[in-house]
Amino acid sequence: MTEASSGPAAKYPLTPSVMHALEVSKRGCDELLIEAEWLQKLARSEATGVPLRIKLGLDPTAPDIHIGHTVVLNKLRQLQDLGHQVIFLIGDFTSTIGDPSGRNSTRPPLTREQIEANAQTYYRQASLVLDPARTEIRYNSEWCDPLGARGMIQLAAKYTVARMMERDDFTKRFRSGIPISVHEFLYPLMQGYDSVALKSDLELGGTDQKFNLLVGRELQKEYGQEPQCILTMPLLVGLDGVEKMSKSKGNYVGVTEAPNEMFGKLMSISDDLMWQYFTLLSFRPLAEIDLMKQEIAAGRNPRDCKVLLAQEIVARFHSQADAEKALEDFNHRARGGVPDDIPAVSLSGAPLGIAQLLKQANLVPSTSEANRNIEQGGVKIDGATVSDKAVKVAAGTYVVQVGKRRFARVTLA
């Protein structure tokens, strides 16, 4: 889907601050469409003093977010710091349809109650990044519910099946004989109509959302509006350095995780992956990051830079004091020590199987995970590695460790 530019007609001066705003906008992005239009929107905003309206649509299909989700949120915050207004759009209507983006099957819809509960949790966590004073929260049921059958049909008439089939996921499913429900064609139309209702100047999304974002741009033209620009952000690679960050893959860092856990996970990433994290997650100037690369090439230990990254992210979601304490505890553990503030857990049922003990102490989510850690030599009791899954632990108080970062002082009766 390509097109000619049809953005702001008037020319405004491209001042140094406007060019800086463009640089901030493009940092780490996958694609900015159409750059010349966005540049003129930025220039107009500076000349007139009217903030631009920047939209992020969210279908809250899960309640908790990880730092991979914050890649887009960080970009929004950077644009807020330039003086622009963010519209945090809750897709309570579109979530009842189910977004087909990137799917090879139909996505099950959610109830309004599930959506609202997830949305509240998501926004509470997103507020750790966004500036609430420059964030407008909207629900797309405000304009989608009143459409009714007549309005929905009129909207559907503005797009063809051929245009819909330009989407890769629809094409793949069609060629593979996998059913595509008619209601799935409505999803990108409804997301696009959100842009019309909000009169957005820019819409952000992941690379998998590009088609939907372009539909919004086309619909704005149909309704006589200046079309929004589009900025897509890459998907953050997970801790394993291979696949995108995902809870299902276990390669994620949750934004509500404890400071020590968050810090330790970030310190575990590879030196090469560190640079993507700096670009997409850090607010440090690119010039400073480039200087770090030069210093490492000249012999500086990459660990020093990784510490700065981990501290910055922990401080963002907790506090600077928590970040400093997490570094102290990390160094202590690296020397073979035990953190000072490990949780104390009281259990009963001695003698208790080691897998059950680990699960009941909340050191692992399941006994199968406990057994996996034992097999890999990742479980210690009072510093001694446990290698036998059949071990039963007698009554007493022990320091139990799983992996490098999970500790508990367990009293078993």
Swiss-Prot record:
| SMART domains per UniProt | S4
Source taxon at top rank: Bacteria
Sequence motif: 'KMSKS' region, positions: 244-248
Which Pfam family name is an example for this entry?
Answer: S4
Principal cellular location given in the protein's record: cytoplasm
Task: Please name the GO terms that the record assigns under molecular function.
Answer: ATP binding; RNA binding; tyrosine-tRNA ligase activity
* Location within or outside the cell: Cytoplasm
Q: Which Gene3D superfamilies match?
A: HUPs, RNA-binding S4 domain, Tyrosyl-Transfer RNA Synthetase
The answer, when asked if Ligase is one of the entry's keywords, is yes
InterPro entries (alphabetical): aa-tRNA-synth_I_CS, aa-tRNA-synth_Ic, Rossmann-like_a/b/a_fold, S4_RNA-bd, S4_RNA-bd_sf, Tyr-tRNA-ligase, Tyr-tRNA-ligase_bac-type, Tyr-tRNA-ligase_bac_2
**Enzyme Commission designation:** 6.1.1.1
Its EC top class is: ligase
Family of this protein = Belongs to the class-I aminoacyl-tRNA synthetase family. TyrS type 2 subfamily.
Assembly mode: Homodimer.
Question: What does this protein do, in the record's words?
Answer: Catalyzes the attachment of tyrosine to tRNA(Tyr) in a two-step reaction: tyrosine is first activated by ATP to form Tyr-AMP and then transferred to the acceptor end of tRNA(Tyr).
Protein name as catalogued: Tyrosine--tRNA ligase
Organism equals Cupriavidus pinatubonensis (strain JMP 134 / LMG 1197)
